[in-house]
């Protein structure tokens, strides 16, 4: 990742509401690949070596500050508040106090541009330095540039000014080269020129773009054309979905180049920060969320959803398994249709089969719960077998209670273990048992009613019913009413 060798500060503009999102949430908090929009430009600036990075917040300022601080705890962040949203120049001025005493270039970028690469930021920073220009700015060429400020160049082909669409003439609207909202400018020049920006425009706002003609007279402007896919902002849900697809596609490509098989990248979904080991296989429609780590040679089946899960090497996750905040050791087999809830810890070569739910429980090496079981707040020893339909009754209405099952124990199908309870190593629990007391190691426990079999009972019952029907006959007519006539 490129890092500038010279001092560099950055300002990320993240104060807007984003009315086109039609949302109660600030625009920059909407997520792409599991991260807020503003996370990406901030992270790219940090990767480039910018310090400090000043984030200008406004709408839902506290929420934006909290989200970015949590997502980038090591970043050299500072926050500045734009109390009123009076335009982009006004937003940049809000960062002046946070950069007090700083001398050097300042990179200015928008908080709604998640697809920018650090290499693109470096190109804008270095263009100013190479050209010895007052300002460098990024431009992009669009087939349909509606809504963007048009770049007007001088006779020598250098950017001379940027005209916002509402202020543009018909000829200027025909220009397809537009402002990408990414600038690099010397701090001293920035504050000096922004003090002169006015509101003589259709929006009656302080435009940062007014800096361009001032800079053109003060030392020139260097233009850098960048890919439109990278620099385009996110303004509505459609653009959000597109940005998400592009970002996930980049992640998928990086994984595949590192030796991961993603069977259908178009049906792969993951968050920034997910890790996948070499020779892992990811089947279609898998969703990998949060800080999930998938080990080498692990296979994740169709439709699996893993959130903050840690899977060791050689794990098999069969289709439609759901994992949240759980650990799975090497060689374990999960699913299909199993669920690991927070605190589940599945040991090496253990099996958690179809319709088994595990919560805050540990399965030892080779332990098996192959179908239709609930294991909560349990410690299950190595090699233990949990029969179909087994339930650990961990909740008594007030607290969660533990169940301990020893190594090699065998729990018969449809058993109910009422916690707190301990089943000793090698013990057997007969199928259909309801247990409330400890079972010693090597013992057999039966907690069910004794079976009673009555031979010939069905025939006897049918005979009794037949005799009753013969003896009863038709019901007598009620007094005062004529007997009902039979149909002839």
From Swiss-Prot:
<dbReference type="GO" id="GO:0019134">
    <property type="term" value="F:glucosamine-1-phosphate N-acetyltransferase activity"/>
</dbReference>
<dbReference type="GO" id="GO:0006048">
    <property type="term" value="P:UDP-N-acetylglucosamine biosynthetic process"/>
</dbReference>
<dbReference type="GO" id="GO:0071555">
    <property type="term" value="P:cell wall organization"/>
</dbReference>
<keyword id="KW-0511">Multifunctional enzyme</keyword>
<comment type="similarity">
    <text>In the N-terminal section; belongs to the N-acetylglucosamine-1-phosphate uridyltransferase family.</text>
</comment>
<dbReference type="GO" id="GO:0000287">
    <property type="term" value="F:magnesium ion binding"/>
</dbReference>
<feature type="binding site">
    <location>
        <position position="385"/>
    </location>
    <ligand>
        <name>UDP-N-acetyl-alpha-D-glucosamine</name>
    </ligand>
</feature>
<dbReference type="InterPro" id="IPR011004">
    <property type="entry name" value="Trimer_LpxA-like_sf"/>
</dbReference>
<keyword id="KW-0677">Repeat</keyword>
<feature type="binding site">
    <location>
        <position position="235"/>
    </location>
    <ligand>
        <name>UDP-N-acetyl-alpha-D-glucosamine</name>
    </ligand>
</feature>
<feature type="binding site">
    <location>
        <position position="413"/>
    </location>
    <ligand>
        <name>acetyl-CoA</name>
    </ligand>
</feature>
<feature type="binding site">
    <location>
        <begin position="13"/>
        <end position="16"/>
    </location>
    <ligand>
        <name>UDP-N-acetyl-alpha-D-glucosamine</name>
    </ligand>
</feature>
<keyword id="KW-0961">Cell wall biogenesis/degradation</keyword>
<dbReference type="GO" id="GO:0016020">
    <property type="term" value="C:membrane"/>
</dbReference>
<dbReference type="GO" id="GO:0005737">
    <property type="term" value="C:cytoplasm"/>
</dbReference>
<feature type="binding site">
    <location>
        <position position="374"/>
    </location>
    <ligand>
        <name>UDP-N-acetyl-alpha-D-glucosamine</name>
    </ligand>
</feature>
<comment type="subunit">
    <text>Homotrimer.</text>
</comment>
<keyword id="KW-0479">Metal-binding</keyword>
<feature type="binding site">
    <location>
        <position position="235"/>
    </location>
    <ligand>
        <name>Mg(2+)</name>
    </ligand>
</feature>
<keyword id="KW-0460">Magnesium</keyword>
<keyword id="KW-0573">Peptidoglycan synthesis</keyword>
<feature type="region of interest" description="Pyrophosphorylase">
    <location>
        <begin position="1"/>
        <end position="237"/>
    </location>
</feature>
<dbReference type="GO" id="GO:0009245">
    <property type="term" value="P:lipid A biosynthetic process"/>
</dbReference>
<dbReference type="GO" id="GO:0008360">
    <property type="term" value="P:regulation of cell shape"/>
</dbReference>
<feature type="region of interest" description="Linker">
    <location>
        <begin position="238"/>
        <end position="258"/>
    </location>
</feature>
<dbReference type="InterPro" id="IPR001451">
    <property type="entry name" value="Hexapep"/>
</dbReference>
<keyword id="KW-0808">Transferase</keyword>
<dbReference type="InterPro" id="IPR029044">
    <property type="entry name" value="Nucleotide-diphossugar_trans"/>
</dbReference>
<dbReference type="GO" id="GO:0000902">
    <property type="term" value="P:cell morphogenesis"/>
</dbReference>
<keyword id="KW-0548">Nucleotidyltransferase</keyword>
<feature type="binding site">
    <location>
        <begin position="110"/>
        <end position="112"/>
    </location>
    <ligand>
        <name>UDP-N-acetyl-alpha-D-glucosamine</name>
    </ligand>
</feature>
<feature type="binding site">
    <location>
        <position position="27"/>
    </location>
    <ligand>
        <name>UDP-N-acetyl-alpha-D-glucosamine</name>
    </ligand>
</feature>
<dbReference type="InterPro" id="IPR025877">
    <property type="entry name" value="MobA-like_NTP_Trfase"/>
</dbReference>
<dbReference type="Pfam" id="PF00132">
    <property type="entry name" value="Hexapep"/>
</dbReference>
<feature type="binding site">
    <location>
        <begin position="87"/>
        <end position="88"/>
    </location>
    <ligand>
        <name>UDP-N-acetyl-alpha-D-glucosamine</name>
    </ligand>
</feature>
<dbReference type="GO" id="GO:0009252">
    <property type="term" value="P:peptidoglycan biosynthetic process"/>
</dbReference>
<feature type="region of interest" description="N-acetyltransferase">
    <location>
        <begin position="259"/>
        <end position="488"/>
    </location>
</feature>
<dbReference type="InterPro" id="IPR050065">
    <property type="entry name" value="GlmU-like"/>
</dbReference>
<feature type="binding site">
    <location>
        <position position="341"/>
    </location>
    <ligand>
        <name>UDP-N-acetyl-alpha-D-glucosamine</name>
    </ligand>
</feature>
<comment type="similarity">
    <text>In the C-terminal section; belongs to the transferase hexapeptide repeat family.</text>
</comment>
<dbReference type="InterPro" id="IPR005882">
    <property type="entry name" value="Bifunctional_GlmU"/>
</dbReference>
<dbReference type="InterPro" id="IPR018357">
    <property type="entry name" value="Hexapep_transf_CS"/>
</dbReference>
